[in-house]
């Protein structure tokens, strides 16, 4: 029997916690637990029992995600018209939910993205906000399900009265670096892979034929999200123990992180007047850049809203 290590979780000093923050905390703690050669037992400090943040985290499934018998199970909280608790999305769930009237995994993901956006925005009206958020959720889920090799990802999100919205998609898969290694991309290494991943036309499917590329992946999803964030908010991409942050004032940060899988956190602080036009302009610019590098053109799905 392996030795056991009790670890006390003390979050009592945290007064406010957005989805991006608690997702990162959860991944750090989970990776710590998984990488030890002894059994880690998480316990919640007594001083946390009266914390409003702990109440919120227990409600959204944070502790269940860590494997603690505390608070709601993942997927059991109903959420509200301002937030989506931690929810599991799997290929099997999507097929079971939508297969009666949809044909492909991409169709299922589109339906799920629209459903999540309706919850987040309290409306099904196809406003510019609705279109750009649906697009972003769809591309982030596609990235997770098509590249992680686990068939499962987790989503959580929140919106605020000032129009700000934050969307988190995370998985515990192989990570972007290992995924891109399958494409034999020139000059790829474990320091530059995130920079390559946000370039247009870079995908693990680069060396696949059209017949083999069953998901019609062309390597434009992260490229578009990166440029959307540079104009309208903030993007965090963490994968294969590295992270990249970009903000709408064009500031960028890079560094190391413990998580092997992938986290995509996109925050909208403002919205385009014409989402379709913005996406098309970004993709067109990307196609020109990709052509100069001999890479793929975008798929129809990558530029559709």
Please give the residue ranges for each predicted region.
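Short beta-strand element(s) in the Bergerat
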Residues: 163-167, 262
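Conserved short strand/loop->alpha-helix "switch" segment adjacent to the catalytic nucleotide/phosphoryl-transfer site
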Residues: 16, 20, 114-138
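N-terminal assembly/transducer modules of large multi-domain enzymes
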Residues: 1-67, 265-305
């Amino acid at each position: 029997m392996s030795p056991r290590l009790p670890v006390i979780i003390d979050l009592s000093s945290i007064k406010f916690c957005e989805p991006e923050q608690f997702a990162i905390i959860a991944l750090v703690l989970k990776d710590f637990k998984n990488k030890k050669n002894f059994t880690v037992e998480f316990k919640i400090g007594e001083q946390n029992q009266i914390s409003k943040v702990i109440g919120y985290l227990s409600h959204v499934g944070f502790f269940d995600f860590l494997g603690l018998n505390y608070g709601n199970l993942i997927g059991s909280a109903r959420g509200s018209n301002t937030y989506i608790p931690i929810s599991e999305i799997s290929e099997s769930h999507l097929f079971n939910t939508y297969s009666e009237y949809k044909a492909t995994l991409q169709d299922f993901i589109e339906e799920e993205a629209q459903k999540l956006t309706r919850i987040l925005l309290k409306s099904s009206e196809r406003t510019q906000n609705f279109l750009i958020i649906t697009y972003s959720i769809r591309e982030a889920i596609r990235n997770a399900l098509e590249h992680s090799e686990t068939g499962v990802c987790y989503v959580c999100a929140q919106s605020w009265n000032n129009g700000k919205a934050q969307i988190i998609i995370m998985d515990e898969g192989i990570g972007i670096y290992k995924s891109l290694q399958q494409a034999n991309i020139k000059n790829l290494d474990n320091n530059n892979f995130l920079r390559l991943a946000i370039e247009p036309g870079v995908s693990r499917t680069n060396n696949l034929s059209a017949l083999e590329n069953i998901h019609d992946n062309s390597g434009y999803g992260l490229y578009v999200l990166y440029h959307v964030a540079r104009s309208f908010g903030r993007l965090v991409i963490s994968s294969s123990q590295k992270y990249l942050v970009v903000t709408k004032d064009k500031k960028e940060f890079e560094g190391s992180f413990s998580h092997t899988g992938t986290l995509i956190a996109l925050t909208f602080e403002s919205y385009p007047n014409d989402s379709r036009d913005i996406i098309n302009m970004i993709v067109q610019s990307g196609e020109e850049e990709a052509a100069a590098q001999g890479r793929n053109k975008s798929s129809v799905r990558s530029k559709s809203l």
